[in-house]
């Protein structure tokens, strides 16, 4: 993977919109407030090119070893005008991009134009998002946290495989396990959806502690996974599945069960651009045929839940307490 220098970043132009793949459909999730009526719209074409072809071309520009991670990475390129110029979809970075869209709950396609602007001007824009209310169990800036939800349900969110100076991981683990021992919840939900990895060993005492407490108390365990579950977090999900009586709930992971890793970097001598590369191939599951780790229970986020502030995966886990 090759990075970009500050000079190159300063020259990038983008359109004020953000797309996301929702169950295979490319959807407008962020737009200028003055254009908020297109939020939730499905994008059919860009400059007359079907989205399937756009994504197929853009997929060659990102490092990936499964479809889930590819879509997550490509989404970050779809508002950058140079992506379309490189793919031959746009002639230059100054002309408007034309998107054919079908509005949410609409029926007929229509054309919407977006004017490219310099990257540094983005902070001056008034942007609107389809997501206006985050659920209590949504993504947090904390590395890890725990809270009780519903009745007799403990929610443990683990967002990075590293320790936090404000509360070292061993302290957090001890507090969670002590709470379980004393309060005896009926269900534990472990959330790994936003964890991009780190040191997988840090969470193993929690996994082993959950296994022992589950044997003694008989509570159920659901492990939430998704497109943001990657690397060491994926290993922790596999460990939870193997060492405890648990279910994987959510969507296919961004990381693959068997994948390249142990990243190193080099600086290209002429451009000064930093490039990263993998040095090892890790086999986490010898029975896997490759690709994402699949959930036992599929719970795909939908636009209605996002707008209402409902956590689709947590709701699915709570259906069977």
Please name every model-derived segment.
Residues 103-111, 133-321:
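C-terminal "post-core" interaction segments
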Residues 1-187, 194:
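Flexible, low-complexity junctional segments that flank or bridge functional domains
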